[in-house]
């Protein structure tokens, strides 16, 4: 039996089927709620539950330390009755926005010893409609899929650029190293909610770990295209300098924004350049900033990295609603 999900202070209601998460039900109904990892790690989908009952979805936690006493994780629960929720934001999706394409490999190069820079081209006359920071699914022949963030900005819509880290034993990590020009992949996009607002002028701190740089590159290239002027800092962390694999992007942003600040964070303490921070990205945040009350932080990386940065930012006065996360969480259906 389906139950109805009502969004507080709106006329929006949608059905939630048995065995379906509230988040999936919303997306199926064309309603976008904040989300990223869909595995309970990022906390983006936390929403107040005002009325009704829920149960766990597929054994997932319905709450985490990121939730207030009133909140539940919409990716981790299903409706056990009609419920009323109050998400931090919502919007109606364009039902025609999400598309599936057969994309061709245009080029496949190594950006770092363990990172492939994969450029895809869409069929002639087709364009990918997405927003900076969103991700796509790569559908594999066996029915599984893997998710990766678009690294190119939305105005470069005739193709897609992905940054793929080679994970030992990873399903797509093995495939990507064998792909050559002309090979095809089935892709579907876009996925993911957008937290950053292009018209926001508050100081922005972007924090990335490894290939968490990909969605941040899309965001910053988009802001540059829009000629947005704001104080922007990028903290990019890797084990060694080779993991900071796209210095040309940094150089371009320095020319775009004279006030742009870049902090490289290297954890291999025996291999730290003179101009880099020795340590983790959360350590770099604490070292180079004071009070963050008036800032916005956008963090992309592993669950542990995101959590450590979230804790540091909170300790430094950042308001919870000004921390936006894109968690690269490994799952049965893939990871960014």
UniProtKB/Swiss-Prot annotation:
Transmembrane segments: none annotated. Optimum pH is 7. About 20% of maximum TPADO activity is observed at pH 9, whereas no activity is observed at pH 5. It is an enzyme of class 1 (oxidoreductase). Residues 3-91 form the 2Fe-2S ferredoxin-type domain. Keywords: 2Fe-2S, Dioxygenase, FAD, Flavoprotein, Iron, Iron-sulfur, Metal-binding, NAD, Oxidoreductase. Residues 98-197 form the FAD-binding FR-type domain. Its EC number is 1.14.12.15. This is Terephthalate 1,2-dioxygenase, reductase component 1. PANTHER family: NADH OXIDOREDUCTASE HCR, PROTEIN RFBI. GO terms for molecular function: 2 iron, 2 sulfur cluster binding; FAD binding; metal ion binding; NADPH binding; terephthalate 1,2-dioxygenase activity. The lineage of its organism: Bacteria, Pseudomonadati, Pseudomonadota, Betaproteobacteria, Burkholderiales. Optimum temperature is 30 degrees Celsius. Approximately 60% of maximum TPADO activity is observed at 15 degrees Celsius, and activity is completely lost at 50 degrees Celsius. PROSITE patterns: 2FE2S_FER_1 (PS00197), 2FE2S_FER_2 (PS51085), FAD_FR (PS51384).
């Amino acid at each position: 039996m389906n139950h109805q999900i009502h969004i507080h202070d709106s006329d929006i209601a949608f059905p939630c089927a048995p065995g379906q998460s509230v988040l999936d039900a919303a997306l199926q109904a064309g309603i976008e709620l904040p989300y990223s990892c869909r595995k309970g790690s990022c906390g983006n989908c936390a929403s107040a539950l005002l009325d009704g009952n829920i149960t766990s979805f597929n054994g997932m936690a319905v709450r985490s330390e990121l939730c207030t006493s009133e909140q539940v994780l919409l990716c981790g629960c299903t409706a056990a009755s009609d419920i009323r929720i109050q998400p931090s934001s919502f919007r109606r999706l364009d039902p025609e926005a999400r598309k599936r394409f057969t994309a061709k490999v245009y080029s496949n190069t190594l950006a770092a010893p363990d990172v492939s820079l994969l450029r895809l081209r869409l069929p002639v006359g087709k364009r990918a409609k997405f927003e900076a920071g969103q991700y796509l699914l790569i559908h594999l022949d066996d029915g599984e899929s893997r998710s990766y963030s678009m690294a190119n900005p939305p105005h470069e819509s005739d193709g897609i650029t992905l940054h793929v880290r080679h994970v030992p034993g990873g399903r797509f990590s093995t495939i990507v190293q064998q792909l050559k020009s002309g090979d095809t992949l089935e892709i579907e996009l876009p996925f993911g909610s957008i937290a950053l607002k292009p018209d926001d002028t508050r100081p922005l701190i972007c924090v990335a770990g490894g290939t968490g740089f990909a969605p941040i590159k899309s965001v910053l290239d988009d802001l540059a295209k829009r000629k947005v002027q704001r104080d922007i800092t990028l903290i990019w962390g890797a084990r060694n300098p080779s993991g900071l694999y796209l210095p040309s992007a940094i150089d371009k942003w320095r020319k775009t924004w004279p006030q742009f600040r870049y902090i490289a964070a290297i954890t291999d303490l025996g291999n730290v350049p003179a101009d880099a921070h020795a340590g983790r990205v959360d350590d770099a945040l604490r070292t180079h900033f004071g009070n963050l009350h008036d800032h916005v932080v956008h963090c992309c990386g592993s669950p542990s990295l995101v959590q450590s940065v979230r804790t540091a930012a909170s300790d430094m006065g950042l308001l919870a609603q000004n921390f936006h996360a894109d968690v690269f969480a490994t799952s049965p259906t893939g990871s960014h």
